[in-house]
């Protein structure tokens, strides 16, 4: 090694952990590199790994899975309020469970609908 490299190595040996961390950050910033990519060491020789980005689902279907006989009226009221269906249509939907009651709703709204159904005594799921 050259004398210059030896001097740099000796200087690096004297750095505290905090100073070393700051140095890494500064090198990443200055040279637009990511030090965490090289941490794998031998893994890098295996070839580039394909990383698939997992998208978080934003729309959900609310499914009415099961309605106990003694909770049918309470669940029927919740289904009517969630769907806007008439009494006859909501009754048919509740009696034909498992059935989808809402489609393509936001996560918060879907979780709230599921909670309402479960609070009324039914079983619901999100898909």
Curated annotation (Swiss-Prot):
SUPFAM superfamilies recorded: ClpS-like, Ribosomal protein L7/12, oligomerisation (N-terminal) domain
GO CC annotation terms, alphabetical: chloroplast; cytosolic large ribosomal subunit
Subcellular location: Plastid, Chloroplast
Superkingdom per UniProt: Eukaryota
One annotated GO molecular function: mRNA binding
Alphabetical UniProt keywords: Chloroplast, Plastid, Ribonucleoprotein, Ribosomal protein
Gene Ontology biological process terms in this record: translation
InterPro entries: Ribosomal_bL12, Ribosomal_bL12_C, Ribosomal_bL12_C/ClpS-like, Ribosomal_bL12_oligo, Ribosomal_bL12_oligo_N_sf
Pfam families xref list: Ribosomal_L12, Ribosomal_L12_N
Positions with biased composition (Basic and acidic residues): 105-121
Region (Disordered): 104-127
Entries under CDD domains matching the protein: Ribosomal_L7_L12
Entry function: Forms part of the ribosomal stalk which helps the ribosome interact with GTP-bound translation factors. Is thus essential for accurate translation.
NCBIfam families listed in its UniProt record: L12
Quaternary structure annotation from Swiss-Prot or TrEMBL: Homodimer. Part of the ribosomal stalk of the 50S ribosomal subunit. Forms a multimeric L10(L12)X complex, where L10 forms an elongated spine to which 2 to 4 L12 dimers bind in a sequential fashion. Binds GTP-bound translation factors.
Family to which this protein belongs: Belongs to the bacterial ribosomal protein bL12 family.
Name listed for the protein in its UniProt record: Large ribosomal subunit protein bL12c
Source organism: Trieres chinensis (Marine centric diatom)
Gene that this polypeptide is encoded by: rpl12
